[in-house]
């Protein structure tokens, strides 16, 4: 039979250290309660003992045996026997009998028993002897000191065997109160010193003093660590222990200060490489003192960084679960601010230390918080992820974040915030193509093959060449300078995950609020999509537009995505995008000044891709129709939108020179212009004129006026009607953003009115008419007299 394996695990040292203060307090209370219960038991026994002695002394003891007396049958006979016993004089008893009775009176446990109610005594001698033996066998307790409690220690084993070890448990001396029973039963009341109540001003002064002391302590520890990190790495633990500040007056503030201080310390003292754990061979080898000191610094840094991240994670988790520990001195309301500081620190570490240990753990913590209900927390996390994407040149950290976000979105069944997917727009994928061109020009040095080395180099030279190549390889790894192939591989894997996420949403969650972010992302990365997916993707986009379930902004995103696809690798495809032109032409009139200007920016991007960049595929009739509709739309939108639309009209008039016929009257051509027709090819736009420009010449915004005059003159590049360089060299989107009134400011600023005409001040009499002036003065100077009012005359006249 195999020995039964003990499944109970030995608690680790970390677990033993984590014993809470509440548990220790409960242990101490239980110990004190046991001591008090032991004392009470002892007092109770002593009280019973004294009472039994008093009763025994006051009563006359009965003899052990009485052969004549049997169990009474009648009450009268018993009373007579009692009278005879009481009448027995003490002179008839021997001295030995009296001494025996006194000795028996001292035995409390013996006298407490009711001897009179014992079983009847028989006359026979054997029976009498058995009764005496029975009493002799009964245990007797004397009035002695209580037994001392023993503590069992670990036994000692020697040749003879196991020797148990014990020790007396220390017991406090208790004064025995023997006066009254009532005094023994009354518990001692502990008189507590009354706490002195402080006023609000005094409390604030005390709190300020405590907080100042804690700040000085934090600053001292942080400065000592920064001055010499390798020697003072142990002080990180002391600083981190202040995260458990228990003073309720300054607990929240001190914890926030410690979190921020530790975050800045780790950003400063962390090396620019990842610290790996040592192997057994490395631990066993002898090293120099400097190397040993560096190893101790790295191990201490990694362990304290790990514990710090665990503390931040626990703070955020407790806040999310809305629970606090019983011993916690921080309220739930204040815990929210503490959790926000913890999230901010995690975001800073995510951006600042993407190369260091536990970066993936930080990503796993940050990504779910991007979808948090708190807007502040969600924005902080999304901004941190965007910063990471923008500054990540290699792509390793971006790939890790993309994997976690994709899995989170899928796990939540695509019910997440759109801001999570909008972070994909900050990926640095396009820069690979630029770097590829530069690297093609400056090609890296290729290593020689074995045959080339053998032909050109001697044996010693080959040996040195091999050592040099090995050194170059190690330096490249140390500097983290990855090759172009490595970057392309990482970026390809990242884009695959991004497109898989986008296509899943297009397929399964077409009515999701994530659709605009998906379409915007597809529009940005459309040039990197495989050509094989273009046909299916365009069909899906057209189906979404025709379904009617999308808002005008979402439908504009579909149009923008479709033309981004067709303007890149899609040029080789024979696809007619006329339906997308029609949809954009139809959607333009849904924009107006009563709505937000977000749609205008998308329209400007679409017009640039659809008309300017595809000028060879755009017909003359289509260009005329769009120019006419853009000028009409400029009348009903905000000034910055009008400037962007007029700038686009100027570009189209330069791109399609024959559109200047719209500046003539509408009597030329055949047919009638149909402004409400949804087909731009058949609306007869050549039969109309841009009369809207005359209305825009009187616009209150000076830049709109300038653009209208410039377009009426035929959009010249030179001359008095030409635009200033600050307007002509900027794109339509840049002008739209530059003159935006989102900040509630007018650009250009409104000039103050400085009229040179002075108002004529009337001196003397206010009224120029003398008769009126005299009449007013007379009535003002008259003394009012009370005259009774009589309306009877008026009533009579009215009746008549």
Curated annotation (Swiss-Prot):
Keywords carried by this UniProt record: Coiled coil, Isopeptide bond, Nucleus, Ubl conjugation
Entry GO terms, CC: nucleolus
UniProt feature, compositional bias: Acidic residues: 78-90
GO BP, one annotated term: DNA replication initiation
Entry coiled-coil feature ranges: 450-489
Region (Disordered): 37-90
Per UniProt, location of the Glycyl lysine isopeptide (Lys-Gly) (interchain with G-Cter in SUMO2) cross-link in this chain: 333
The name this protein goes by in its record: Nucleolar complex protein 3 homolog
Taxonomy of the source species: Eukaryota, Metazoa, Chordata, Craniata, Vertebrata
Gene responsible for this protein: NOC3L
């Amino acid at each position: 039979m195999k020995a039964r394996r003990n499944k109970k695990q030995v608690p680790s040292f970390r677990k033993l250290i984590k014993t809470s203060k509440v548990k220790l307090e409960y242990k101490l209370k239980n110990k004190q309660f046991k001591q008090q219960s032991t004392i009470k038991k002892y007092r109770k026994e002593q009280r019973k003992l004294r009472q039994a002695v008093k009763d025994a002394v006051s009563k006359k003891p009965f003899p052990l045996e009485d052969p004549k007396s049997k169990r009474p049958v009648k009450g009268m006979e018993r009373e007579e026997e009692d009278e005879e016993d009481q009448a027995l004089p003490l002179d008839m008893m021997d001295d030995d009998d009296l001494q025996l009775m006194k000795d028996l009176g001292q035995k409390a446990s013996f006298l407490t028993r009711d001897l009179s109610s014992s079983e009847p005594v028989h006359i026979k001698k054997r029976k009498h002897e058995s009764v005496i033996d029975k009493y002799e066998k009964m245990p007797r307790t004397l009035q002695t000191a209580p037994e001392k409690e023993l503590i069992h220690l670990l036994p000692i084993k020697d040749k003879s065997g196991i020797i148990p070890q014990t020790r007396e448990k220390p017991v406090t001396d208790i004064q025995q109160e023997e006066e009254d029973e009532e005094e023994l039963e009354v518990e001692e009341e502990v008189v507590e010193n009354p706490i002195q109540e402080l006023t609000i001003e005094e409390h604030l002064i005390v709190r300020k003093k405590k907080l100042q002391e804690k700040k000085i302590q934090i600053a001292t520890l942080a400065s000592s660590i920064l001055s010499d990190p390798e020697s003072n790495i142990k002080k990180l633990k002391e600083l981190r222990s202040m995260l458990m500040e228990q003073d309720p007056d300054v607990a929240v503030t001190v914890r926030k200060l410690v979190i921020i201080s530790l975050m800045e310390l780790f950003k400063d003292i962390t090396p620019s490489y990842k610290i790996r754990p040592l192997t057994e061979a490395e631990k066993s080898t002898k090293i120099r003192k400097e190397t040993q000191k560096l190893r101790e610094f790295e191990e201490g840094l990694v362990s304290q960084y790990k514990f710090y991240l665990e503390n931040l994670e626990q703070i955020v988790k407790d806040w999310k679960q809305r629970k606090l520990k019983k011993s916690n001195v921080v309220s739930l309301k204040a815990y929210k601010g503490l959790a926000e500081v913890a999230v901010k620190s995690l975001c800073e570490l995510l951006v600042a230390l993407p190369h260091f240990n536990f970066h993936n753990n930080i990503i796993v913590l940050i990504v779910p918080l991007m979808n948090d209900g708190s807007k502040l927390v969600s924005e902080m996390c999304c901004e941190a992820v965007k910063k990471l994407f923008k500054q990540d040149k290699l792509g390793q950290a971006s790939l890790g974040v993309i994997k976690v976000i994709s899995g989170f979105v899928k796990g939540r069944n695509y019910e997440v915030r759109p801001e999570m997917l909008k972070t994909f727009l900050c990926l640095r994928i396009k820069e690979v193509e630029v770097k590829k061109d530069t690297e093609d020009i400056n090609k890296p040095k290729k290593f020689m093959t074995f045959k080339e080395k053998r032909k050109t180099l001697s044996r010693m030279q080959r040996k040195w060449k091999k050592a040099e190549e090995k050194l170059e390889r190690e330096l490249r790894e140390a500097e983290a300078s990855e090759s172009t192939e490595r970057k392309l591989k990482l970026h390809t894997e990242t884009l695959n995950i991004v497109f898989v996420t986008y296509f899943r949403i297009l397929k399964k969650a077409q009515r999701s609020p994530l659709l605009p972010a998906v379409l915007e992302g597809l529009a940005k990365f459309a040039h990197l999509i495989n050509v094989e997916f273009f046909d299916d993707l365009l069909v899906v986009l057209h189906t979404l537009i025709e379904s009617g379930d999308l808002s005008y902004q979402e439908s504009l995103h579909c149009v923008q995505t479709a033309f981004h696809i067709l303007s890149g690798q899609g040029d080789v495809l024979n696809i007619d995008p006329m339906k997308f032109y029609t949809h954009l032409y139809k959607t333009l009139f849904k924009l107006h000044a009563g709505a937000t200007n977000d749609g205008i920016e998308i329209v400007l991007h679409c017009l640039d891709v659809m008309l300017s960049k595809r000028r060879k595929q755009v017909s003359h009739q289509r260009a005329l129709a769009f120019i006419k509709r853009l000028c009409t739309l400029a009348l009903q939108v905000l000034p910055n939108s009008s400037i962007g639309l007029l700038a686009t009209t100027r570009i189209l008039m330069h791109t399609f020179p024959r559109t200047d016929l719209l500046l003539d009257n509408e009597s030329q051509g055949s047919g009638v212009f149909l402004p409400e027709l949804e087909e731009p090819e058949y609306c007869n736009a050549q039969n109309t004129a841009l009369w809207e420009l005359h209305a825009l010449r009187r616009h209150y915004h000076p830049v709109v006026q300038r653009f209208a005059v410039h377009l009426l003159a035929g959009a010249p590049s030179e001359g008095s009607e030409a635009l200033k360089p600050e307007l002509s060299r900027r794109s339509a989107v840049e002008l739209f953003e530059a003159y935006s009134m989102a900040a509630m400011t007018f650009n250009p600023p409104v000039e103050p009115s400085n009229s040179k005409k002075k108002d004529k001040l009337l001196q003397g009499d206010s009224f120029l008419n003398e008769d009126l002036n005299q009449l007013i003065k007379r009535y003002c100077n008259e003394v009012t007299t009370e005259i009774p009012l009589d309306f009877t005359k008026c009533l009579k006249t009215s009746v008549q």
